[in-house]
Amino acid sequence: MTLTASPTAARTPAEEKARFEGNKLAKRLARETTRAIADYNMIEAGDKVMVCLSGGKDSYALLDILLSLQKRAPFAFEIIAVNLDQKQPGFPPEILPDYLRALGVPFHIETQDTYSIVTRVIPEGKTMCSLCSRLRRGILYRVASELGATKIALGHHRDDILGTFFLNLFYGGKAKGMPPKLVSDDGRHTVIRPLAYVPESDLIAYAQFKQFPIIPCNLCGSQENLKRKEVGRMIQEWDRKHPGRSWNVFNALSRVVPSHLMDRDLFDFVGLKPTGVADAGGDTAFDQIDPEPDTAGPGCASDAPAGQADGMAEQRVVFR
């Protein structure tokens, strides 16, 4: 009788540690994705989810995680992977079909030469990403209708959402971000972002752990959006020097207080008048009722460090 060493025994300590860390990461990604799906009711019983697969780390991870969740979900839903071959020079057309066939996942490859359109319209050396994205979005909406998909799943992550918020804030003068769930402007499609709670660093590590066959995203030769790269570096620097800061900003996007901003469409400042009734959710702990002039004490001096508002010490907000 021939004895065969078990796979575990054949691994080195370093390999075993990498496997352990990878499995722990996979569980964390599944947990955060499940939480985002539940928080925003992204996937429902009977849905046909069209997962948009570009060949990048984010969309590979999205498909992998959704397939894992599909097996243990309390309700049934379908998954179909869709890739748009835009005829970019050097794009390897066989990688995604081979990968998806090996997984046994239903898929559709849509071929549309948007590259020629973009290069004809955009001057050489200019960023093509915006027009390319708009053309791609329109095609994917059409394909979703043809396939009968009820949800369109995109691989945007936490850092994408933060980056879009800051781009709109810095360069557009708007407090506008990238929602985890939206209905398309034509009112026909629901777009979801199940990786909304996942930081990019985790997706980079997951792609290395799973060894996804990554396809480069700059085959078109276009200059990547420099402003988005700048904002991305800013967020990375925060995470390095001030752990928790970017998470606090991210958390603030879901804790908006319209009465303490300035948007008259969100809050009726014009019609605002005192009611004589205390706000049950307000802070009245230090309010004084009709203080006597001679009993009012001096103003309280702030002990907060310079440049830091009272009580606003930076801390990381942890989702549970």
From Swiss-Prot:
SUPFAM superfamilies given in the database record = Adenine nucleotide alpha hydrolases-like
Q: Which cysteines are joined by disulfide bonds?
A: none
Supply the enzyme class, top level: transferase
Q: Which UniProt keywords apply?
A: 4Fe-4S, ATP-binding, Cytoplasm, Iron, Iron-sulfur, Magnesium, Metal-binding, Nucleotide-binding, RNA-binding, Transferase, tRNA processing, tRNA-binding
MF-aspect GO terms? 4 iron, 4 sulfur cluster binding; ATP binding; magnesium ion binding; sulfurtransferase activity; tRNA binding
Keyword Isomerase recorded: no
Q: Which Gene3D superfamilies match?
A: HUPs
Q: Where does it live in the cell?
A: Cytoplasm
Instruction: Please give the cofactor(s) recorded in the UniProt entry for this protein.
Output: Mg(2+); [4Fe-4S] cluster
The note describing how and how many cofactors are bound reads: Binds 1 [4Fe-4S] cluster per subunit. The cluster is chelated by three Cys residues, the fourth Fe has a free coordination site that may bind a sulfur atom transferred from the persulfide of IscS.
* Gene Ontology BP, a term: tRNA thio-modification
Residue span of motif PP-loop motif: 54-59
Pathway where this protein functions: tRNA modification
Q: Which residues bind [4Fe-4S] cluster?
A: 129, 132, 220
Q: Which reaction does it catalyse?
A: cytidine(32) in tRNA + S-sulfanyl-L-cysteinyl-[cysteine desulfurase] + AH2 + ATP = 2-thiocytidine(32) in tRNA + L-cysteinyl-[cysteine desulfurase] + A + AMP + diphosphate + H(+)
Q: What is its EC number?
A: 2.8.1.-
Fill in the misc note. The thiolation reaction likely consists of two steps: a first activation step by ATP to form an adenylated intermediate of the target base of tRNA, and a second nucleophilic substitution step of the sulfur (S) atom supplied by the hydrosulfide attached to the Fe-S cluster.
The record describes the protein's role as:
Catalyzes the ATP-dependent 2-thiolation of cytidine in position 32 of tRNA, to form 2-thiocytidine (s(2)C32). The sulfur atoms are provided by the cysteine/cysteine desulfurase (IscS) system.
Per the similarity annotation, which family is this? Answer: Belongs to the TtcA family.
According to the record's subunit comment, the protein's assembly and interactions are: Homodimer.
Q: What is this protein called?
A: tRNA-cytidine(32) 2-sulfurtransferase
Source organism phylogeny: Bacteria, Pseudomonadati, Pseudomonadota, Betaproteobacteria, Burkholderiales
Which gene underlies this protein? Answer: ttcA
